Amino acid sequence: MGKIHELSSVLADQIAAGEVVERPASVVKELVENAVDAHATQVDILVQESGVQSIRVIDDGDGIDDAEVLTAFKRHATSKITSREDLFRVHSLGFRGEALPSIASVADVVMNTSTGATGTSIHYRGGKLLQQSPAPLRQGTDITVTDLFFNTPARLKYLKSPQTELANILDVVNRIALSYPAVAFRLVHNAKELLKTAGRGDLQQVIAGIYGVQNARKMVAIQGSTTDFKLSGFVALPELTRASRQYITVLINGRAIKNQQLTKAVIKGYGSKLMVGRYPIAVIALTMDPLLVDVNVHPTKQEVRLSKEPELAKLVSTTITDRLVDVNLIPSALTNLGSHRREHLNTDQLAMDLNAVSSQYQVADKTTPASTEQFAASLAAATMQPSSATTMVSTTSAQPSAVNRAAVSAVVPSESAASSANQPIMISHRDELTATPVQAFDQRYQSESGALPFGETAEPLETSTAASAPTSEAPDTERFPQLRYLGQMHGTYLLAEADDGMYILDQHAAQERINYEYYRQAIGEVSADQQNLLVPIILDYPTSDVLKIKEKLPLLAELGIHLESFGGNSFIVHAHPTWFKAGQEEDTIREMIDWLLQDDKLTVAQFREKSAIMMSCKRAIKANHHLDDQQARALLAKLPTCENPFNCPHGRPVTVHFTNSDMERMFKRIQDSHEARD
């Protein structure tokens, strides 16, 4: 007998199953996708012991003709494609013809299927046909998989914990449900219903069923298109985040896919609105010509290759960015304070309007998609548990201690000063702190102009050409309210009011945002302004780092950092940009060089962004710094002029909002509707 021989069909199927059927979730995925491809409108998934004991999928789809049932269990047998051209225009979820034979080769499979005219029951175990018989059934398919991996114990041994395997099944079903909102899905584990969608074609209803009504209310619809691509979906407001990227779902032509570039594009669309290490909930549905996407990359069909991927990524990021510009991003304090109880939803509860993305998230001059308008009919009818807030707020007008009074003084650029740039607010140390009348604040600002960054000085008001001209940075009162200062709490938070309630602001985050927008613009400008050093800075690095640094010298020079070789592995710096914080010049330069050493693909834009964030944080006031009334009011007056006054550059919220009704509820001046009925 020769050394080379053909493998048996059963062994070949078991080998193929190693790629197609990795875990119980893989079985669920393949069977549910088959049901969707068969035009099912209702799919029930019944799982026992995380799928290891049994998996049953019932659908009302087309069914399989009795003459083709055996063919369906042969390798590479499919109804999805017939020619080579079809492979480049795949519209179905499955097309490789590997799922059923792969599953049948490593498990016990019983399938009952009917086209409505005739029905068939078939039984496979370990790839061998045990029984086939007629079975009168309604139209659809009912397939049960038991004893998974009974003949491949190594695969069974390396399964994760039951909780992890169940979580994988949930993730698979969730993503398919998000891909096909017109199909009603029901997932039951050990007789407990874990997921139920209504199948009414409304994506936001499905999001509510998966992530909860409270979270769905904090998501906004997005739409965008180019010549080649069409985009729709929902993205969470920046306050609704998770610790991992797995809550970002990208769908291409109805298929949930994994693509690192598109996931990054979603995150990029939020910019600095997200906290560091936090990621949004997002469902991005993309439609394109099948010729632009190759799904025949891996048997699981989750990894795809995209034509024009940079253009698609740009569409995703810009659509999200533009949408969030129109949304009031001030979070409700009560919504984020209490602990929310998980809601168990029935189908009736899912038929609610979530487009009221809550009155606290008002959208300016945007039309609502038709699907969301249908949703907008009954959010008030949803059964909600009121957030309980036991937080007590104590406001006092106590003056700062003598030590703290001597510690701070604000220098705030005048809106009518000669430079119309968005200057950062500087808090500097002084021996004495004397109160300044509001009317004399501009004069005080001029007298302290030496503390201005970038070596600038303010022109006298009477000679300023900008003094009589209307400011170009009028506060956007529709997006951010004009606040009236009330007081300071613990030297960290500012209390303010507006017509719609009370606001609490993090003074560090607020000033950091103001500074960031100034530095982002200033660092991006080519400026010859340099501050000479009395004592040059000497920087020593190992040889491997020196080679990398020399490659990046042009990039450093664009930001005004000029390194000169100083023999061996050393560099010397004679001057630095004027926007460096005094006393931290060497630390700042070293930190910037470290960025380049850690990421050799860092672009100029990314480098400037990181520099702006670093400088804005270094020059912002910290917690436990008491401000006088003029300083606090100046901070509140400057904040609305920011492009994004809602978050600091690291994504932390600048302010939270207690509405008038929130305050009345906390003090029991009004009752929630469900309390009134009790």
Curated annotation (Swiss-Prot):
GO terms for cellular component: mismatch repair complex. InterPro entries: DNA_mismatch_repair_CS, DNA_mismatch_repair_MutL, DNA_mismatch_S5_2-like, HATPase_C_sf, MutL/Mlh/PMS, MutL/Mlh/Pms-like, MutL_C, MutL_C_dimsub. GO terms for biological process: mismatch repair. Belongs to the DNA mismatch repair MutL/HexB family. This is DNA mismatch repair protein MutL. The keyword Kinase does not apply. This protein is involved in the repair of mismatches in DNA. It is required for dam-dependent methyl-directed DNA mismatch repair. May act as a 'molecular matchmaker', a protein that promotes the formation of a stable complex between two or more DNA-binding proteins in an ATP-dependent manner without itself being part of a final effector complex. Transmembrane segments: none annotated. Coiled coil: none annotated. Gene3D superfamilies: 3.30.230.10, Histidine kinase-like ATPase, C-terminal domain, MutL, C-terminal domain, dimerisation subdomain, MutL, C-terminal domain, regulatory subdomain. One of its GO terms (molecular function) is ATP-dependent DNA damage sensor activity. Keywords: DNA damage, DNA repair. NCBIfam families: mutl (TIGR00585), PRK00095.1-3 (NF000950).
